[in-house]
Curated annotation (Swiss-Prot):
Interacts with PEX1; forming the PEX1-PEX6 AAA ATPase complex, which is composed of a heterohexamer formed by a trimer of PEX1-PEX6 dimers. Belongs to the AAA ATPase family. One of its GO terms (cellular component) is ATPase complex. This is Peroxisomal ATPase PEX6. InterPro entries: AAA+_ATPase, AAA_ATPase_domain, ATPase_AAA_core, ATPase_AAA_CS, P-loop_NTPase, PEX6_4th_dom, RecA-like_PEX6_r2. Transmembrane segments: none annotated. Its main location: membrane.
Amino acid sequence: MPGITETSQVTGPVLAHVIVTEDPYDASERAFLSTDLYELLFEDYANGSKSGLTLISIQLMGSSLFNEFQTFKVYESEEQLPPNTVNLCNMGNIIDYSSDFTVDSGYVARVDSLVKLDTVIISVLPEVYSLASQASQHQLVDILGGNDQHTVIRQGDYNKDINGKISLCEPTDQGFLESTTKIIVVKENSLNLPLLDQSQDGSLNYEENVKMNLEHSISNYFSLNSLDPENQITTTGVEFSVKCLDSPISVRKTAKSISVAHDSEDESSPKLVEEDISNEDTLLYAFCKTTELAKIGCLSGDIVKMKSGQCQCTTFECNCESCPVQYRYIRIHAFTDPNTYEKGCIYLNPILSFNLNNPKIVKLCPISIPDKRFELQGFHFSKFIPLAKQVTIARVSSPVTLDRTLQTLFLTNLKTYFESGRKVLSKDQLIPIPVDTLLAKSIFSTYEKLGVDDSQFPTVIPEGKPDAIAWFKVTEVSGELADSASQQFIIDPLKTKMMQSGVVSCSPPKNSQHCNWANYLGCGQMFSFPNVSGVTTSTFEYAKTLRKLIKATIDPSRLVNLQTTVLLSSLSRAIGKSLLVHSLALECGVHLVEIDGYEVLNPSSESKTIGTIRGKLDRVVEGCTPLIVFIKHIEALTKKSEQQQKDSLAVKINELIDEYTAKPGVLFVASTNDSDNLSDELRAKFKFEIVLGVPSEQERTLIFKYLIDFDQKTTPKVTEGTRELSFAPRNDLSLSSLSLQSAGLTPRDLISIVENAKTLAVDRVESLAKHHNVSFENMVYSSGGYIKFTPEDVEKSINTARNKFSDSIGAPRIPNVKWEDVGGLDVVKDEILDTIDMPMKHPELFSNGIKKRSGILFYGPPGTGKTLLAKAIATNFALNFFSVKGPELLNMYIGESEANVRKVFQRARDAKPCVVFFDELDSVAPKRGNQGDSGGVMDRIVSQLLAELDGMSGGDGGDGVFVVGATNRPDLLDEALLRPGRFDKMLYLGVSDTHEKQSKIMEALSRKFHLHPSVDLDKVAESCPFTFTGADFYALCSDAMLNAMTRIANTVDEKIKRYNEELPEKSQVSTRWWFDNVATKEDIDVLVTLEDFDKSRKELVPSVSAEELDHYLRVRQNFEGGKEKKVVQENGQTEHFSNGSANNHITFGDEQVVEAIDENGNSIIA
């Protein structure tokens, strides 16, 4: 690596060599810089103009385990170090890897200051926790290094003094430990530490361990040196499982090919010669763990043979017919250690993998040429792969390659692809060319308006951000083939004649999680809609259905053309219908052409609309297979009309659908936000209709995981002198908590939440940097080089999204009413726990069809806390809350009222776990047949409500949805509502019948008051009658607070009056000035006294009279056992049964009859 030549001071990242050492005499962590690097980063310290503590932040390169910047103290510059070098001494987390550490470079940046840590959370094992938890805060700080004034604590480090892992640091991931830092010790069963090399007795002996591993590694590698003529390699190959890389891995270009040449003076002794391989085809680079190289018998950077069959067998020696074994020459590299890659696996780039038909297993063999090894002039691909004389490349027919507006850009990119190096190709190989479609269309439209011919388009085009792939296929390649099994040719742009002609039809490669070529080529990672099985349901069932339809349609083994047509619909916008089609098209390896109904619609002419559609689709449908024709917003073309006449445009579109789907392998998909507005003629044409709902809790968890992991996988690269701003979640961010709080939101809302959380995180870091007088850049380095968004940032973002879009999307919110706000209803609370807690904690008990009791009816006098209790249920169980009033459901149009009921329950299912609260239920579901409304709208609402309640009690559809009703008149309700399975648990909420309960209610209502020490709520309760409801006590406490405020205000007015009397008339002060300058704490502190409560109680009139309470008690007896029925038995005795629920069989002759006595004494015989 070249040394540093610049002399000006820089603060941005600088690429430098890294060495790791261990000092047996001084265990403190520290870093040393070479003299030139120290002068570059700390010029003001080097020339003596500044002194004090110096810090650096370094990100080690090459290993995925060191993807964050870590801050270290710099003791001094070291002249003995080579130029541009950092020496990390006693870095415990690095030393622990022993000989498995091969990182030798990293980006180094200057850090001027760190933040003082407020809190440090340490995770320890259970056997250590009992001892660590007993230590005082002062002892814990001393153990962590509190004696040192500038001890740097880093999140994720393992501290050997306390045998624990630093799990979390606040306010930043790295900072100074102070005596005031709060240390919290928590118990963890596993600390997720790196695998350490241990001696047989389990202790760590670093010196012996490093020495032993180093000697073993050196001897092992020299014995495997492919340049050693004495080494006779007899291996026939090693089998490896195949995995694909997620993103390109850069190979150091200083690693030139090591070749062997003879010394002119002594021909018998070979010497090493470096030859440039920077223009090689990197798609032939494969990677594995360092330990796997010993099995193959090669070094990192050697060329080996990779044999593979063309089947999907899991064993290499298969007996498949038409499966000739072929091999490729590849260059094998070892991953930088330490890493998390699997053993026994070879990692290929996805392009090479799908061109080999995605083999599951390959065999790697070292190249062995007996007696001619030292006649080779270099291990270049050109020594094994011949040069192609001529190559013919054809376009793969696809919507991208057939689009004229994109042609200039992808042909330019194709030329750049071959000019960038010596590519290696074989016949029938697919070549992907990334294209930025937005950039291409902009260039085309700009130059087309200027009247410029295609040949005059610019030859140098910006790279852009690719979002599509233009595929090309090698149809012919000619040259002197040295090995028929390889079929590889080198393409030299200066020597090989290249031709691009013709169009071929074939399917694109399948993009899967195991072979994600789209992400590898920079097109971004698309959400895959995984089908994960849960306790009762699976995630993204609609994606599973569409996936099956696509695979069945494109299956070449089917003899019958299915002519599949699918309509995707949703009740809400931004559900992800278009994303679903794009994702499954990539996954299944199908071409996709998409048009927007609003863009092709010509309201004035149906023929022009059809002509526009044909102009966009005819050529694509004719030339591409398999293909998905996707029209979004299809409702724009044919809307349902009130008239009973046929829609001529819908008829023509139906003819187009028949024409397109008549071709095998073509699938027609359309999407709409409201399928009911689609014309009946067109809707009837679709054989399958798939409804996309709002994501469930488990689905939202997967979406959040995708959004957050996606950001980490696309972390911007650090380049010398610059570092792009990147984001990452903090360790304590809980996806399950986020998914619970975001109930009812669409995927687009979830994306907005994550983006807003990033903005809030930036604002928080800027505010923190200003508060601690630290630069923003240093704050970012303190967090590992990322802007970390915290759970608080995401929760604020969720609340902002709900407040902003609650009216438009109807998003439910969790109310903030706790059990402490509800007083005197302990018995009712227990009943609620039995009804709601069991289905939520043990849903598996109801997965086999067992019906759960999900309906609760609160009834009783007004003001007894029915609505408050329903909100407390939602808060206590973290449920979303829907409140439904009767007038909200009524609509003047026939059928719309019932549709409103259906929408309420559908929204509840989308937002589950959820509570649907029907306030004043008697106005929503009165007895059927008693209303005189025209059309019987109330009867239909009740019938629809009964049907929805039956769906809620089932084991599948209503999982996580609970229905709560409240009414003052249960005698007016339809009897069908009160049967088991609907509102089957009736809870009476009456007035408090003891002074103790009354005291608990006032305690709950006044828990935020400042009460005078003389106030005894028990005494206040003893003076209250038993006719006071909860609302009356609320009025009592509110009036008492108002009396106290009035009393304080009058006292303040008197004080201001006396104060002004002592001043001259012209110097009178205002009330505001007096509060700002004269008032004391006693003047603004409102203390509620016993006199305030007495005055409020004397003025309060009960809202429910004693006679009304007696009426409600009679109603309660009616519903909870007051209807005792007498059953006459054969022996003449009478038994009492509640609600007539039990009858007795009586025998008269040979017949059995049932006789019951109703409450009026009448005999009933059935």
